[in-house]
Amino acid sequence: MAPSWMSFERERIKSNMIIGFRAFIDFERPSQELIEAYRSLPSANIGDCCYKMNCMFDGIHSFNDIPLCGPAFTVKVPAGDNLVAQLALDYAKPGDIIVIDGAGFTNRALVGGMMVTYAKEKQLGGFVVNGAIRDVDDIKNSPIPVYGITQTPLGPYRSGPGEMNVPVCCGGQVVMPGDIIVGDHDGIVVIPQKDADELLQAVRKNLDHEQTEMKKMKSGQYTLQDHQKEFLEKFLKNGGVFK
């Protein structure tokens, strides 16, 4: 059962609905079929098909080496305060990725072992934190994927304000509610929901082409120099240097 203070804050955020302290609970999510299609695709290939424009910076990394894929449930909080991030766990749906914009502040943790344990009970899809986490040992033993910048023993404030399901900035990328978040050992890529169907076909084609080239390289039929030459000629042609 949620503590009494949380019930009070839940009602307060629902009644305020002013900039800085508001919650938008309902938003469109991509189909489960589309999410599952992306789950098996490497973040690097997805990033390549976005011209490397949709990848979060390398400071945000996995703390328990578990890949993630799901719709973004965005949270925006002041530096070092996780009141609204905690409240978000009650509103998020199974499979949602809690994307927390903590402005990159790392002196206080925004997510810890208790929140991750609760997320497991709620069957959430994971956390991506533009800030710090703590209780690393608990997180390493959890099946819930957790990505963040660093760790600290210092806990957060719980004073507010904050916002749910507004545009946020995380790892240098704008994330909208419902965008598909894919994370693995290489990092995290953000897929705008409106582009997800079209991008999927491009990523599959890119991956097939890459795997074919890898097979040729392993058999000695194709060298890295061949690949570089082919890429360079294509680049120069697209740039108008070659006709």
What kind of feature is each model-predicted range?
Residues 3-177, 191-243:
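Feature captures the catalytic cores and cofactor-binding loops of soluble hydro-lyases/lyases
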Residues 184:
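Beta-strand-loop-alpha-helix segment that lines the small-molecule cofactor/substrate pocket
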Residues 181:
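C-terminal binding/interaction regions
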